[in-house]
A protein has these predicted regions:
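Extreme N-terminal starter segment of soluble prokaryotic enzymes
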Residues: 1-4
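Glycine- and acidic-residue-enriched helix-capping/strand-helix junction motifs
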Residues: 15-29
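Short beta-strand elements in bilobed, periplasmic/extracellular small-molecule ligand-binding domains
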Residues: 38-49
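N-terminal small/polar loop signature for handling phosphorylated ligands or for N-terminal nucleophile
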Residues: 51-94
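Flexible, gly/pro- and Lys/Arg-enriched active-site loops
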Residues: 79, 84-135
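Conserved small/polar residues in nucleotide/adenosyl-binding loops
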Residues: 142-144
């Protein structure tokens, strides 16, 4: 059975509570439940993990190699623009990556336009709200 790892970075635990005009009204837990149902229907495992701590995300990425994860679906949050450590962790495990952003990072403040992951990702989904998570999972089922 294929397994996929959904990772969410800092502040995504506040979905549904923080800047709902940008990030929507649904919680991360609600989004994850919907994705787990899609995974079950497609006979794949979806593991989920969120952390505000960079080192915990690095550890989870590295554990994915041992678990033989087929693909990482990753919304790095603010780490998108700052984390060489997470980039190196992904390169180190050689697992395909799909980068996800709820908002369009290229249509926001200039500090959000640089991503440390886009050039190593299979694809990027940005600006489609929580539907971007569903699109990432469905596309990974086809392409990975």
């Amino acid at each position: 059975m294929k397994s996929f790892l959904l990772l969410n970075g800092p502040n995504l635990n506040l979905l549904g509570k923080r800047e709902t005009n940008i990030y929507g009204e649904n919680t991360l837990e609600h989004i994850e439940k919907g994705l787990i149902e899609i995974a079950k229907k497609n006979k794949v495992e979806l593991m989920t993990f969120q952390s505000n701590a960079e080192h915990e995300l690095v550890d989870r990425i590295q554990a994915g190699k041992e678990e033989k994860v087929s693909c990482i679906l990753f919304n790095p949050g603010a780490f998108t623009h700052t984390s060489v450590a997470l980039r190196d962790a992904i390169l180190g495990v050689d697992i395909p990556l799909i980068e996800i952003h709820i908002s369009n990072i290229f249509n926001r403040e200039s500090l959000r336009e640089k991503s440390y992951f886009s050039d190593i990702a299979v694809g990027i989904i940005s600006g489609f709200g929580e539907q971007g998570y569903k699109a990432a999972l469905e596309l990974s089922l086809i392409h990975i």
